[in-house]
Amino acid sequence: MSAPKPMLFTPLKIRDVTMRNRIVISPMAMYCAENGYLNDFHSHHYAKFAMGGAGVVFVEQASVIREGRITNGCLGIWSDAHAQAMRSMVAFIKSQGSTPAIQIAHGGRKSSTQRAWEGNGPLTQKNFDNGDEAWTPVGPSSTPLAEGWLKPRALEVEEIHALTVAFRDAAKRAVEVGFEIIEIHMAHGYLLQSFLSPLANKRDDEYGGSLENRMRFPLAVARAVRDAIPQGTPLFVRISAVDWIEGGWEIEDSVELSRHFKEIGVDVIDCSSGGNLVTGATNSNLKREPGYQAEFARRIKAEVGIRTEAVGLIRTPELAEALLQKNSADLIAIGRQALFNPFWPHQAAEQLGANEAFENWPRPYAWWLSKWKTGLLAKGESLNNWRA
């Protein structure tokens, strides 16, 4: 009797979309766009992950308005032209058997900053000399992210309403060019998460103060997007389950928020953490170890009854499989591991005994690799060493 197929390589159907396995390529900003437009770098970058066997390939956060970009190199989806530039890339991802997905976002008080490798802080004269432009970041309040960062302008109520529409329209554009999953970015200190966190939100109107008020704008965005996209299109939301800072957002808040998301029709909670940098130390309880955020996914899944996605230092197929088997999550996201090895999903399948004949690899690769493996076996070499 053959061994049961690893859960990591079982399909998952959500609404009208079936993912071929439970591996998700997490959205990671590349800071390589020009005026918000996707270019050849992005097309090749995302093609690797689809060929590498991931169930879902997320395109990095795309800003819903021009001034919502984190950096001058960030992707945008604030116009039809920006969305249309992604169409052929989306089609290729799908042609390789992966589900194309996109994260839509607004950088909030982290906007108008340097690219990560330039320092990840406020723009300098060197940036301006290189052609970068600056704009005023916005947030729930005028509280800057940290000492030395630009002071954001507090959004007016009318602007909050306009941004809700911008998220809605961005989601509609994404679906029109073929994206099959939409994720709203509500984590890592960006605009929507800064409304949730008491560390950033100091408003005294209907969008600040109580938990109910702080959730109002993010929930309005989720509702607008859910109403705008087809019923068969899954909607994910990425959250920071905790701030990791005393007096900040806690897991109990995330559980309550997720209950509201479930009522709206959100399908998956993508459980990350942190990002609201403030002057002072991060909570000493933060220990970055393999799977350190998976407990947040487990708790939200158990207490809310909603699907979750675990992310964060999930480096081995064995850990990914164990998290699924323990019912800690429904999907497993990898990021830097996929950058280091885009073929991690295919190799994980072989390692867990789910892809012995390379049947899930791109056909040309499968043919060559099968011959290679056969040759090694003929020489009497150990199967334990064939990948070396």
Spans of features found by a protein language model:
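Flavin-dependent oxidoreductase catalytic cores
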Residues: M1-A388
